[in-house]
From Swiss-Prot:
It catalyses: RNA(n) + a ribonucleoside 5'-triphosphate = RNA(n+1) + diphosphate. HAMAP family: RNApol_bact_RpoY. This is DNA-directed RNA polymerase subunit epsilon. GO terms for biological process: DNA-templated transcription. It comes from the Bacteria. Keywords: DNA-directed RNA polymerase, Nucleotidyltransferase, Transcription, Transferase. Its EC number is 2.7.7.6. A non-essential component of RNA polymerase (RNAP). GO terms for molecular function: DNA binding; DNA-directed RNA polymerase activity. RNAP is composed of a core of 2 alpha, a beta and a beta' subunit. The core is associated with a delta subunit, and at least one of epsilon or omega. When a sigma factor is associated with the core the holoenzyme is formed, which can initiate transcription. Pfam families: RpoY. GO terms for cellular component: DNA-directed RNA polymerase complex.
Length: 69
């Protein structure tokens, strides 16, 4: 399954919506996504499962790149 992760790069700073970034990651569950990213200093705001039409829409975006972890 493919997940879209919304995050702030520095977990020690106050989250600001304009600084929110996203990445795409393949994993079996949301828990696995969080475990894969735990060594990074990210403030994870939201993990969203992509499927169906929404996945197709995201894959059509030039910003769609699966992270390799």
């Amino acid at each position: 399954m493919i997940y879209k992760v919304y995050y702030q790069e520095n977990a020690n700073e106050i989250p600001v919506r304009e600084n929110t970034k996203s990445l795409y990651l393949e994993a079996a569950s949301e828990r696995e996504v969080r475990q894969k990213l735990k060594d990074r200093n990210y403030n994870i705001e939201f993990v969203q499962l992509l499927e169906g039409n929404y996945l197709e829409y995201e894959q059509a975006s030039p910003n769609f790149v699966l992270e390799e972890i």
